């Protein structure tokens, strides 16, 4: 093939499309039909080239209600940044970490926010954690994306405004875990410019930013992550005193 790999991702349709070309969002049936076509091409490429070449993103499987493929399907996870194989990697990493033997796990109750698309899978991980360690309670909140509207359902586009609106008065603990994928590169602001500190103040709780990898997520649930030290601001003066 002329390219190393191709990621197939469903278009995200927001509520702000007035005057733009009409796009029809995928539903469970159309996502399943599209997956069937892509998986046929994947099988052909794997037979001819020894790898899939075409990689459907995780959204297709979640929309279609299908289990994501095993790790072998994703080869080297070349399209991870486009959301291809992210859930499989998260799931396997989380499960491996959860199986690691532990003793004296302290009781802990937390709330976790995520997008509506991944919520069933995150709940699965939360329930698995509670089953192994009954003293750990994890309440998962699926945040409906009112800020962007439309069919936007991924965790990475959830805003602080929507979290406040949907979680205020509904938390089961004083700790809210926010996946770092919801924050900008600086890891301190949501897409609506609300800071993690402002979120905590609005909800009256502590905010814990948790890693997007499965092992880190598992450790966060168990209270094993140490807070990262804050970077010191450097002050420079040029000329004069």
PLM segments and residue spans:
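Auxiliary Fe-S-binding modules of radical SAM enzymes
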Residues: 5-7, 12-241
